[in-house]
Amino acid sequence: MIKPIIVGNWKLNGSKKLIESFLKQLNQFLIKYYKICTVVIAPPVLYSHLIQNMFSSDKKNFFLGAQNIDIHFSGPFTGEISPIMLKDIGIKYVIIGHSERRLNHKETNEIIAKKFCMLKEENLVPILCIGETKKEKIDKKTKDICKKQIDIIFNMYGSNAFDNSIIAYEPIWSIGSGNSAAPKEVQCIAHFIRNYVKSKSNHNIENFFIQYGGSVTKNNAKELIYQKDIDGFLVGGASLQLEEFSKIIEITNI
């Protein structure tokens, strides 16, 4: 059985006060689930050390994540973060390709693929977000869009691209809307993604996970995690609410 991975994407949220209160309680909660679930928190990067210091080194199921990297390893690029820097401070998982960055920062598939390759070069775990808009869904282009976003990774990195990697299927129309995709629909797309990646890999792919993201809450997590090809969640707003996030973790492990 695959060990579920639950990632909390805090986006541009958080404070020292929130972290001290939230993680003190989460730390105790995770003791119960350390063998059967991996939990990742991706805060604004400047809070990473504070979070690290609040978790004891014996927490084998807890990891720090980041929300983005630059397309350069170093140099005169004001305000950017390098994967080398993230690795240096103990971050393991990095979200790339989120629709908010595609839209607000005009990140193309090519830019995202380059970031993916940089993460792999540093032995970090990319969490590649893919998904369709509402119009693309209506036009029945979901699978074509997912294929396009996956293909460029294979074209740039090669057939072993998705070993030790995560794809988060996040239908753009559901993010932040409160309207999650139907579980059977999610399973259909996740199954397609898994088979497509396997067919392009030309080997027995290892440590490849598929998450669902898009208005994940304690109310829909149970039915979603029961889907065969869903290995966990990329949680947005709900990951900032201790009771909600803890319940999602608990449900995932039922």
UniProtKB/Swiss-Prot annotation:
Its EC number is 5.3.1.1. Signal peptide: none annotated. The gene is tpiA. It comes from the Bacteria. This is Triosephosphate isomerase. PROSITE patterns: TIM_1, TIM_2. The active site is at 98 (electrophile), 170 (proton acceptor). Its main location: cytoplasm. Involved in the gluconeogenesis. Catalyzes stereospecifically the conversion of dihydroxyacetone phosphate (DHAP) to D-glyceraldehyde-3-phosphate (G3P). The lineage of its organism: Bacteria, Pseudomonadati, Pseudomonadota, Gammaproteobacteria, Enterobacterales. One of its GO terms (cellular component) is cytosol. Substrate binds at residues 9-11, 176, 215, 236-237. It is found in: Cytoplasm. It catalyses: D-glyceraldehyde 3-phosphate = dihydroxyacetone phosphate. It comes from Buchnera aphidicola subsp. Cinara cedri (strain Cc). Belongs to the triosephosphate isomerase family. GO terms for biological process: gluconeogenesis; glyceraldehyde-3-phosphate biosynthetic process; glycerol catabolic process; glycolytic process. Homodimer. Pathway: Carbohydrate biosynthesis; gluconeogenesis; Carbohydrate degradation; glycolysis; D-glyceraldehyde 3-phosphate from glycerone phosphate: step 1/1. Keywords: Cytoplasm, Gluconeogenesis, Glycolysis, Isomerase. GO terms for molecular function: triose-phosphate isomerase activity.
